């Protein structure tokens, strides 16, 4: 019997199969774009989410300070949604990479807070892949790349508190806990140890967040209030709007005229591109600065301080808000890790 096996057909089928797979991955017609970055993003974020939910519910107490006094963060150990958290890795681990195979067993890995590193590292890498996917999808559609630049702001902010700060402080136990009250605890301790409220870059971040909220509300309300009416007065404005139409749906000149007279002329934009660039750039740049500030304070380049009180020519103390802030910082610091050391560094 003649052998009819043909290797060229096998390679052709293989190429056609992989061509189909690659075409599906890179297709911009899918309901959910995948892309090369999506191959990384989807499994990483799924793993991070599943591990976070499981740890939040079931994880046993973690020896966060490395002094054999475990702290419980899971719901099954008496916490609620507010007090629960994924507790950071033990101070005994430091900044060592701590996958499960580095522990003697799974119980030891849980006791030392290995779940924190697992969730944080998978999440940061997954979020980075999401940012890359934003660029990739925009590239496929012929769009400009600024969407992924904007997303870099929350990504670098998360990286600052989850990665850079623990590295600078020498231990992942100093990272931000993955919970509501844990976040507040992190903020209070950060203020106590670094005086972040007096750091110029944090001030820029506050201006970015609150200013961005204000500008967003102003822009949305102005646009909604200056829609071009294409219908009779008894019909909704939406009836005269067709999705994808070339004509603008609102009058920027009317909005500009209104706001220019409400405040003053040059407080209002008359160019849509400049306006939307400003709306994107303001919060993004401010959050970049905050992330940079946290990253520098990670290495103890702290906010402005007033460690020496104000005194008059006779040597008498002149009470100021700086004294109150210092006392508040010391009070927060003595309550932080109160069993791990006898005195805070500022008092020792």
Curated annotation (Swiss-Prot):
Pfam family, one: Photo_RC
Top-level taxonomic group: Eukaryota
Major localisation: plastid
Residues binding chlorophyll a PD1, per UniProt: 202
The entry's keywords: Calcium, Chlorophyll, Chloroplast, Chromophore, Electron transport, Herbicide resistance, Iron, Magnesium, Manganese, Membrane, Metal-binding, Oxidoreductase, Photosynthesis, Photosystem II, Plastid, Thylakoid, Transmembrane, Transmembrane helix, Transport
Site (Tyrosine radical intermediate): 165
InterPro entries (UniProt xref): D1/D2, Photo_II_D1/D2_sf, Photo_RC_L/M, Photo_RC_L/M_CS, PSII_D1
Site (Stabilizes free radical intermediate): 194
Residue intervals passing through the bilayer: 33-50, 122-137, 146-160, 201-222, 278-292
Substrates-to-products reaction catalysed: 2 a plastoquinone + 4 hnu + 2 H2O = 2 a plastoquinol + O2
GO cellular component assignments: chloroplast thylakoid membrane; photosystem II
This enzyme's EC code(s): 1.10.3.9
Annotated cofactor note: The D1/D2 heterodimer binds P680, chlorophylls that are the primary electron donor of PSII, and subsequent electron acceptors. It shares a non-heme iron and each subunit binds pheophytin, quinone, additional chlorophylls, carotenoids and lipids. D1 provides most of the ligands for the Mn4-Ca-O5 cluster of the oxygen-evolving complex (OEC). There is also a Cl(-1) ion associated with D1 and D2, which is required for oxygen evolution. The PSII complex binds additional chlorophylls, carotenoids and specific lipids.
A GO biological process held by the record: photosynthetic electron transport in photosystem II
Topology of the protein relative to the lipid bilayer: Multi-pass membrane protein
Binding residue positions for [CaMn4O5] cluster: 174, 193, 336-337, 346, 348
Compartment annotation: Plastid, Chloroplast thylakoid membrane
Binding sites annotated in the UniProt record for chlorophyll a ChlzD1: 122
Enzyme class label: oxidoreductase
Residues binding pheophytin a: 130
Sequence positions that bind a quinone: 219, 268-269
PROSITE patterns: REACTION_CENTER
Function: Photosystem II (PSII) is a light-driven water:plastoquinone oxidoreductase that uses light energy to abstract electrons from H(2)O, generating O(2) and a proton gradient subsequently used for ATP formation. It consists of a core antenna complex that captures photons, and an electron transfer chain that converts photonic excitation into a charge separation. The D1/D2 (PsbA/PsbD) reaction center heterodimer binds P680, the primary electron donor of PSII as well as several subsequent electron acceptors.
Extra remark: 2 of the reaction center chlorophylls (ChlD1 and ChlD2) are entirely coordinated by water. Herbicides such as atrazine, BNT, diuron or ioxynil bind in the Q(B) binding site and block subsequent electron transfer.
Binding partners and assembly: PSII is composed of 1 copy each of membrane proteins PsbA, PsbB, PsbC, PsbD, PsbE, PsbF, PsbH, PsbI, PsbJ, PsbK, PsbL, PsbM, PsbT, PsbX, PsbY, PsbZ, Psb30/Ycf12, at least 3 peripheral proteins of the oxygen-evolving complex and a large number of cofactors. It forms dimeric complexes.
Name of the protein in its database record: Photosystem II protein D1
Organism, as annotated: Heterocapsa pygmaea (Dinoflagellate)
Taxonomic placement: Eukaryota, Sar, Alveolata, Dinophyceae, Peridiniales
